[in-house]
Each structure stands twice: as structure tokens, then as C-alpha cells.
């Protein structure tokens, strides 16, 4: 059986292989016989270590001779365990021995961090670093486009840029993506900056229009308030005039119960007033002895002879409404009834 051990991650020049050779050695202890397993280790090196082999050959032969003397007869020769690498490093301290001892280290980390920092980074770490840098640049660009986070930077435009943007806003208050990119290229700006400028301009326009509408509504409200007060004063005056009129004249067919409307003026019909005056004069000059003589009263004759003011002109609507249907009271009511209205006795009765 052959066992090969490879210690460390040593580069090219040194490679140590150990080939153990198990050997059974009988030992006599009392009446029992025991078997002892001895591993023989053989160290092989390359041509670069020939100088070390010559230095340690004499020491190996001396050690083998001592073992042969102490070993009982009949035993098989066993190669001694020898580690010439450690011996050479302890005695000579040459550069080759240091390299050999370094080959047995199993992935040991260097003591200082300078060596690790000096080594080139792996491709994965470089890719991660570049990705982080791209993300940071993108976030910075987004913050700048959006106006920044805590400290917002105001966009400074020249007079030419401002005038051109104002003219474009008068033509179109909103922009399509193509128009936005064209404006950005023409004014040497980013499309996001043009879009933000148009948004702010629309907001300012809407705010100004709201202020104008508010002022107009305030003026309208004040004007309506003054008009309402004036109308209330007129209504109060008209109600006072109506009360005065109804107290001076008798009620005319319940017109005093009607509500007073704005701008309405109540007038008394002249023909009705004249008829009332004539009737009063006739009642005052009436006497029973006048009828006894068979003559008509002078007052009535004079009243009949005096033409009414509206005789030469067609009667008005109010005169036709009130004068034609005025009831007649007195002893002369039978004389004015037409004879055709009297009921004649029938011939059959």
C-alpha cells in the first residue's frame, strides 16, 4: 500500500511526496509476541534540491547504522523517518530551505494586509465595484433631474432660452415627447428640464387665473349686495305709499289685499271718481216735493246735461269694467229697467 500526501499549495519548484511503506516488526515481550507497525517515509525531491541531498547524506547513513545495530537479527530493513527539509532549514538557513518550508504551509493568510491589498482584485469584485459606481451615477443624475433632494438647484436660463420657451408655451401648453426632445436639443437642455419648466409654467398660469376669477367674483358679490339693499329700500317705500293710498281711498274690490310688487303704482280711475261725485251731488239735492210736481230734479237734469270727460273718447278698460256694471239704487231703479225685460202675462192664462 502506498500513501501519497501533498501538503500546501506550493508552486512549481518544490514538490514533496511521501510514500509510506508499512512493515511488520515482531517484538518479544515475555511469552507473547507483538507485531509493531512501522511506517517508512521516503522523501523525493527534484534536481533543484540535489545540493541539500549531498549535505544530509552523511547524517542519514549514520542514523541508519545506529538502527541496524539496535535492530534484532532477521528483521527487514526499514527506511528511517527523515525530514531533510526541516534539517536543512535549521542548519543552512538558505533560500532554498525557506522555499521548502513555505511549501508545507496550508493556505496560510499573510500577517499584514499590505500583500493582500497589493494583489489584483478578482473579476467579480471589479464587476461589483463598476455596478455600484453606475448605480451611484444614475441616482445622482435622477436627483439632479428632479431638482435634488435636500438642496434643490434652480435652473438658470438665459434670456433667449426663456423667451423661446415662453413662445412655445403660448403655442402649446403641453408637449409631446417629440416636441420635448426637439426643444431640448435646440436649447441645449435635457428633456426632463424642459418638461419641468412647462409643468411649473402651467401651474403659475392656473394660479394667476384663479386669482383673477376670485377678484371678479368679489366684485360681483359687492355689486349684488348694493343692488339688494337698494331693492329693499324701494320695497319699503312702496309699502309705505300703499298704506297711505289705501287709507285715503276706499278699498277697490279687495285690491288692498294684493301684495305690493316692485315698480307697481296703484291709481284711481278718473271715470269712477267722477261718477261717485255725481252720485253724491244727486243724493244731496234730492227732495220728495220735486217728484210731486211731476218735474225732474234740476240737479239730475244738470248732471245729465253735463257731458262726462270721456264722452268724446272711447271708454277705457277700467271704465268699461267698473262703470258699466255699477249697480243703481233708489226709487228710479224701476224706470231704467227696459220694458223687454218685464214678464208679460201669457195669453193662455
Curated annotation (Swiss-Prot):
Question: Which species is this UniProt entry from?
Answer: Oryza sativa subsp. japonica (Rice)
Q: Which residues bind DNA?
A: 150-209
**Annotated region described as Leucine-zipper, given as residue ranges:** 208-252
The keyword Nucleus appears for this protein: yes
The protein's name is: Homeobox-leucine zipper protein HOX7
Q: Which UniProt keywords apply?
A: DNA-binding, Homeobox, Nucleus, Transcription, Transcription regulation
Bias (Polar residues) ranges: 89-99, 121-135
Q: Which family does it belong to?
A: Belongs to the HD-ZIP homeobox family. Class II subfamily.
Name of a matching Pfam family? HALZ
Q: What is its main location?
A: nucleus
Where is the region Disordered?
42-186
Q: Where is the composition biased (Basic and acidic residues)?
A: 167-183
Quote the subcellular location field of this record. Answer: Nucleus
Do you know which InterPro entries this protein is assigned to?
HD, HD-ZIP_Homeobox_LZ_Class_II, Homeobox_CS, Homeodomain-like_sf, Leu_zip_homeo
